[in-house]
Amino acid sequence: MAVASRLAVARVAPDGGAAGRRRRRGRPVVAVPTAGRGRGGAVAASPPTEEAVQMTEPLTKEDLVAYLVSGCKPKENWRIGTEHEKFGFEVDTLRPIKYDQIRDILNGLAERFDWDKIVEENNVIGLKQGKQSISLEPGGQFELSGAPLETLHQTCAEVNSHLYQVKAVGEEMGIGFLGIGFQPKWALSDIPIMPKGRYEIMRNYMPKVGSLGLDMMFRTCTVQVNLDFSSEQDMIRKFRTGLALQPIATAIFANSPFKEGKPNGYLSLRSHIWTDTDNNRSGMLPFVFDDSFGFERYVDYALDIPMYFVYRNKKYIDCTGMSFRDFMVGKLPQAPGELPTLNDWENHLTTIFPEVRLKRYLEMRGADGGPWRRLCALPVFWVGLLYDEESLQSISDMTSDWTNEEREMLRRKVPVTGLKTPFRDGYVRDLAEEILQLSKNGLERRGYKEVGFLREVDAVISSGVTPAERLLNLYETKWQRSVDPVFQELLY
């Protein structure tokens, strides 16, 4: 790769395997993203790392394209990475947990289950163990970024292990964790703020670019899957398919019907929130469906996205309002003379939030957080569609004549009406039935006996009742118009 020959990088030495981890138990680690590493070069929990970089000449656009191209992998090396967020709460009061309580949980996990701490300005802000990490979202949402795994059995085992560990430590502190897409009870002012530098910059910037950005930061939880591609053409097909079907996944996994103690008018308020968070960096990316689309076109898109920050001398420098294109030519007033490294590019790509996101893999970002069975079901659903050639081709054919207007309509209406959203001569539920069958077929052909993980999705589609509608029914009947029982209903 061109970039490899032009950057001399001082890298952190390996940790010496399991024995080394035991020696350093509970001590901070630093993860260094490099252009040559596989999935997850940057650890989600970490502050950005500062490589000792001697630039022989500035990065070019070709280097940025090459960074994305380096994600291409032969099919035998494709992996499945799952990320999921959850709300911590005090079992006695149902109140959101504060940073001090979260710090105690992180310390407890580090001591008891051999995780390494990640520290920013003397605050524990995450954990790392092998290729897994635990990080904190702005309002203290607890996120597991899973390791890249080969099968969905491994994925579900990882989810279960994580939930077991978090529950074991949390229960002793009177803390529970809730699997839902939007905070059902508490106002924005009730949510604690995590001590992470990048979030302070985002918190100040969000109200300038949309009315719901702070809700996105502090009151939402999602589950997403990260999947590989073999070539530019494979990436394009998967990107287009993922975007077209993202509203269908939003409907199936809709699980955020409450806000501040009552129904909010949506089945997936979390999904709706993204429509007025920051339209410069979110949405359905119609240009992905242009004939000219490829890695270079995505780089052009990302270059013009306003930046959030640059990380220098262990500090976040607020660069809001400037583009990465400005940075490429040294035109950041906040960091005069600074030029970007690949680290800066990698960090910038994490501040773009479309329904499907391209890094050196593709992220499917349309689903609400939910209980553990749905955390396993979401990656299964997408793997059956995108990792099987026959299913992927069938979906590509099915969606090839969908217009931008139709895709935008689904994106807009599904958060309100879910599976009952009209589409052409039927409903989203009809589409979901067809897509589910294609996913099952793809899983059968994979040959790992993974179809069973789709039972939860099967039940939703066959009944036509989304998880959110089930909760709304409980609210009106058994719960006597109180949201408090949801904390028990969706407790991990």
UniProtKB/Swiss-Prot annotation:
Disulfide bond entries: 156-376
Please, one GO biological process term?
A: glutathione biosynthetic process
Q: Which top-level group of life is the source organism from?
A: Eukaryota
Q: What is its EC number?
A: 6.3.2.2
Q: What is catalyzed by this enzyme?
A: L-cysteine + L-glutamate + ATP = gamma-L-glutamyl-L-cysteine + ADP + phosphate + H(+)
* Compartments, as annotated in UniProt: Plastid, Chloroplast
Q: Does the keyword ATP-binding apply?
A: yes
Ordered alphabetically, the record's keywords are: ATP-binding, Chloroplast, Disulfide bond, Glutathione biosynthesis, Ligase, Nucleotide-binding, Plastid, Transit peptide
State where it is primarily located.
plastid
An annotated GO cellular component of this protein is:
chloroplast
Pathway note = Sulfur metabolism; glutathione biosynthesis; glutathione from L-cysteine and L-glutamate: step 1/2
GO MF assignments: ATP binding; glutamate-cysteine ligase activity
Post-translational note: The Cys-156-Cys-376 disulfide bridge is known to modulate the enzyme activity according to the redox status. The oxidized form constitutes the active enzyme.
Q: Which PANTHER family match?
A: GLUTAMATE--CYSTEINE LIGASE, CHLOROPLASTIC
Q: How does it assemble?
A: Homodimer or monomer when oxidized or reduced, respectively.
Q: What family does the Swiss-Prot or TrEMBL record give for this protein?
A: Belongs to the carboxylate-amine ligase family. Glutamate--cysteine ligase type 2 subfamily.
Q: What is this protein called?
A: Glutamate--cysteine ligase A, chloroplastic
Q: Say which species the protein is native to.
A: Oryza sativa subsp. japonica (Rice)
Starting at the broadest rank, the lineage of the source organism is: Eukaryota, Viridiplantae, Streptophyta, Embryophyta, Tracheophyta
Q: Which gene encodes it?
A: GSH1-1
